[in-house]
Every structure is written in structure tokens, then in C-alpha cells.
Amino acid sequence: MNKTAIALLALLASSASLAATPWQKITQPVPGSAQSIGSFSNGCIVGADTLPIQSEHYQVMRTDQRRYFGHPDLVMFIQRLSSQVSNLGMGTVLIGDMGMPAGGRFNGGHASHQTGLDVDIFLQLPKTRWTSAQLLRPQALDLVSRDGKHVVSTLWKPEIFSLIKLAAQDKDVTRIFVNPAIKQQLCLDAGTDRDWLRKVRPWFQHRAHMHVRLRCPADSLECEDQPLPPPGDGCGAELQSWFAPPKPGTTKPEKKTPPPLPPSCQALLDEHVI
């Protein structure tokens, strides 16, 4: 399947319905020991933690949408990364969407973020903390040129390279999704220390933020991990294929019905949603 078709499928999956999903009716984490269940794009979470809104090292955006819940491992990762960034004097980490209180499907914007192991982080590190108004209506900084072939040189900063590298070097991180042009710039800037680049994967959009994904926790027995990324730094032919023009004859894929929920997630919905 070519990349245009994949992009259309991802769009359909992330915005299949603008109506509220049953998961949005669950307003508090489900009590219990933390368990990520199912896959990143078809799952849920029991025992989610709430990311503390107040921190000297990070700020949480769009708190009115209440998407600041996740597995305790995700909360600890955010605290760990933002502390590293702060100690290096790089600025304040801006946290976007994590997941809903019980995970599950969004009504739009995300196909994944369902098991409490995904977080979006802006690719800007303000030296001055944002106001409440800025956090509620954040202005994304598009780092990619209009033609999508490279980053905007005046906007690309060494601190952003370091932010992505620090995240990729974290032991719990398995993937970081960024725009292909951003991946390309990372490849150019990386020098000889390149092992971490394997985790950084090119993906559609992601022009102003990175999407960080953690591995399944060892004690979440119903959590489904993705296969590891292909060996190597991912800076060769695979990356260049993202810049090739779409093949002629691309057709819009049919809208697909979401797959059945994992039984444990369906049972959770049955118990907690009237």
C-alpha cells in the first residue's frame, strides 16, 4: 500500500466520528492496579495516573480537554524527560495529549493514545513559561517547509535536536513519530552517535510535535507491543521514499469499521458506562 493510501486510512481511523465515544463518558480513572490493555490503537487502561498539572519543568496544554491521563510509566517518563531538559537549561517542555481517564478511542484527532502509553510533546522549548491563555489555545510552531522536503532553518534549534534525542535514549521509549523532514534533519545532525535514531520514525503530519510511545509495561499482560523498528538508523532508502511523489492512480480507501474491543476493555465499558 502506498503512503498516500496509508495517510488516508490514518485520517479515517482518527476521525471516523465526531460524536462523543463511550470512553469520553468515563471522567475518572478506573480503580485498580495499572494495566495497559490491548493495542495502541484499540485498547484501554485500568489504574491510570493523572499527570500533575503544576510542575516547574513542564506545562500541560489544553487542560480543558482532560487528556492528561496515562500509565504511571508514562507519567514518570514525562517527569524524567522534563527534569533532564530543565537541568540542561533548555527550556520548558510543553505537554500535549496523553490519553483519557480510561484510555480508549477518541472521537477524532488520534487513532492511538488508547492504552496510556502515548504522549504528544511540542517541538519548542520556551524560556519563558506560557500564560494560562497560551496553554489553553497553544500556537504550534511548524518546523517544516511548505513543500515538506526540509525543516525551516531559522526555526530549527539545537535544543529541539537534543529534546528528541533525550526522549529516544530513554529506556522505556520504543518509538517517536516525527515528520519525515524532521527525521531527515536529525540524520544530518546526529554525527557518529546514531543508535537512538532507530526509534525515530517518519510519519505524516507531526510538523510541530513529536509523538512518543512507550513499551508495554512488563506487568501489563494484556498489552500488545508493536514489533521493534527495523535495524539501523532509518536514514537511508526508507526515509527517502517519503519524499517521492505519490504513485498515480491512488484511490481513497473505504471507511473501515473499528475492530472489536479487547474483551477486558469491553467489560470495562459495560461496567462503567450506562
Curated annotation (Swiss-Prot):
Pfam families: Peptidase_M74 (PF03411)
Residues covered by region (Disordered): 228-265
Keywords: Disulfide bond, Hydrolase, Metal-binding, Metalloprotease, Periplasm, Protease, Signal, Zinc
Taxonomic placement: Bacteria, Pseudomonadati, Pseudomonadota, Gammaproteobacteria, Enterobacterales
GO BP, one annotated term: proteolysis
InterPro entries with a match to the protein in the record: Hedgehog_sig/DD-Pept_Zn-bd_sf, Peptidase_M74
Residues reported to bind Zn(2+) 2: D147, H150
UniProt similarity note: Belongs to the peptidase M74 family.
Assembly behavior: Dimer.
Cofactor details (free text): Binds 2 Zn(2+) ions per subunit. Zn(2+) ion 1 is bound in the active site. Zn(2+) ion 2 is bound at the dimer interface by residues from both subunits.
Keyword Protease applies: yes
Biological function: Murein endopeptidase that cleaves the D-alanyl-meso-2,6-diamino-pimelyl amide bond that connects peptidoglycan strands. Likely plays a role in the removal of murein from the sacculus.
Predominant localisation class: periplasm
GO CC aspect terms: outer membrane-bounded periplasmic space
Compartments it resides in: Periplasm
NCBIfam families in alphabetical order: PRK09429.1
Name this polypeptide is given: Penicillin-insensitive murein endopeptidase
Enzyme class: hydrolase
Sample GO molecular function, one term: metal ion binding
Annotated Zn(2+) 1 binding sites: H110, H113, D120, H211
Signal peptide: 1-19
Cofactor: Zn(2+)
Cystine residue pairs: C44-C265, C187-C235, C216-C223
EC numbers, comma separated: 3.4.24.-
Domain of life: Bacteria
